[in-house]
């Protein structure tokens, strides 16, 4: 979280994705009140907030009111401010992860209810990894280990044993041939990737 970039190249030292300098109070941390958001029409959060129905705005305000008050009362600086910003960012990130998890559960329950769970290929993946405080960074712009590691979970009982893992390197271009293979369709010879 407090990497000083000693011995790292220029790109790492001059990057624009540090929790300390780049994580914004408005867009990233949602530290604006309703009045502040609606007053500044140049703020990119304004257009998102303005499109929300009033009842959703009320929920938004309620969800972030304590954070805003805590921030304004705290007068944090240096490492204390970095730590606080990191905690708020992770709180939002983990809330997103929880929402994804809950909705995957809803999907699995529905597929089971209609009798299609074991006949459905379920894939959980992402386009890239993400910095969650490593090196003092957030976001996903550098070719470091954290950004190269992507989740790839496939559930398909007809072809994959539950709980199995693989150390094989895979890429997004492998998805199409894999799905064609699962479906019993011949993979064209000119397609990129491998099943």
What are these regions (language model features)?
Residues 1-170, 182-190:
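Active-site-proximal cap/lid insertion segments
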């Amino acid at each position: 979280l407090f990497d000083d970039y000693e011995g790292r190249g220029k790109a790492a030292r001059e990057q624009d994705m540090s929790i300390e300098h780049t994580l914004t109070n408005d867009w990233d941390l949602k530290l604006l009140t309703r009045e502040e958001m609606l007053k500044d029409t140049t703020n990119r959060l304004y257009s998102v907030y303005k499109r929300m129905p009033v009842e959703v705005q009320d929920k938004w305000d309620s969800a972030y009111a304590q954070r805003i008050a805590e921030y304004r009362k705290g007068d944090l600086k240096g490492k204390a401010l970095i730590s606080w910003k990191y905690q708020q960012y992770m709180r939002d990130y983990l809330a997103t992860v929880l929402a994804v998890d809950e909705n995957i559960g809803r999907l699995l329950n529905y597929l089971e209810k209609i009798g299609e769970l074991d006949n459905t290929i379920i894939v959980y993946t992402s386009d890239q990894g993400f910095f969650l405080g490593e090196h003092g960074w957030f976001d996903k712009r550098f070719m470091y280990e954290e950004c190269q590691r992507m989740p790839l979970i496939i559930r398909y009982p007809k072809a994959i044993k539950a709980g199995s893992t693989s150390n094989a390197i895979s890429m997004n271009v492998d998805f199409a041939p894999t799905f064609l293979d699962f479906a019993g369709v011949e993979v064209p010879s000119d397609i990129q990737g491998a099943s």
